[in-house]
């Protein structure tokens, strides 16, 4: 699918949704509409408060839009979050109109959808039911998945509140997998292509883990959990 961006460069965000809604398509970035049968123009207004997507595929066309309530945030990080959300929603709405398909997770594509529900509960003071309704309404998530998302976020928030200020979690990234999945968004490599890197990586990992332990002890921090990941469960 040819992708034309106007006013932004959120390639990864749009690619995720394109692969979700049109799994047979592959992205090709263009500077103008050349009349290709598979094409999407995704626009973001100069003010950052409105996005529009014009989509064409299989002889059909569709349009989707998303508008921000109020002015965009002045904080750069929040501005990127909100404008990227607009871009994704406008593309999703156009794709949904064209295909008639709404995936169970709606317009959500990341690996931690519970973060959205958790942020909503912290900002509003409302509970998991309200969070589920928000996720369902805002991102087109199915009622069952929205309830699961809110429940997970609620439990995570309870655990977060139970932690002491000096409690930390240690993440150990494993950048190798038996194979690399087509949909993978992690910085990982297949074992077949990176076999020679595994031994030096493990050596460096041992030294870094020991150093992290010493630093935690010096700072009076307590490691309450280790997370080892970065690849698929088959790693």
Predicted features by range, described:
Residues 216-235:
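Conserved glycine-rich "GG(E/T)P / GGGxP" loop and the immediately following alpha-helix
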Residues 99-102, 122-170, 219-220:
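N-terminal [4Fe-4S]-dependent radical SAM core
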Residues 94, 112-120, 130-134:
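A general alpha-helix detector
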Residues 177, 205, 228:
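Conserved, mostly hydrophobic/aromatic
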Residues 1-107, 118-119:
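A short, structured N-terminal alpha-helical element that caps or precedes a catalytic domain
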């Amino acid at each position: 699918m040819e992708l034309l961006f106007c006013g932004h460069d959120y390639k990864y965000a749009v690619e995720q949704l394109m692969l979700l809604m049109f799994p047979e398509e592959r992205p090709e970035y263009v500077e103008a509409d050349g009349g290709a049968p598979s094409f999407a123009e995704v626009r973001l207004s100069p003010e950052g408060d409105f996005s529009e997507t014009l989509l064409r595929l299989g002889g059909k066309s569709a349009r989707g839009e998303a508008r921000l309530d109020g002015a965009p945030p002045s904080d750069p990080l929040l501005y990127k979050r909100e404008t990227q959300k607009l871009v994704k929603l406008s593309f999703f709405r156009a794709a949904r109109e064209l295909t008639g398909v709404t995936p169970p997770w709606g317009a959500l594509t990341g690996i931690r959808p519970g973060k959205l529900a958790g942020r909503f509960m912290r900002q509003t003071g409302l509970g998991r039911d309200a969070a589920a309704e928000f996720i369902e309404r805002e991102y087109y998530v199915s009622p069952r998945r929205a309830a699961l998302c809110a429940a997970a976020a609620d439990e995570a928030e309870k655990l977060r509140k139970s932690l002491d200020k000096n409690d930390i979690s240690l993440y150990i990234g494993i950048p190798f997998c038996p194979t690399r999945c087509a949909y993978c968004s992690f910085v990982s490599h297949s074992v077949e292509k990176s076999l020679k890197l595994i031994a030096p990586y493990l050596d460096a990992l041992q030294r870094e883990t020991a150093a992290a332990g010493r630093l935690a002890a010096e700072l009076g921090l307590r490691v309450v959990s280790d997370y080892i990941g970065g690849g698929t469960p088959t790693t």
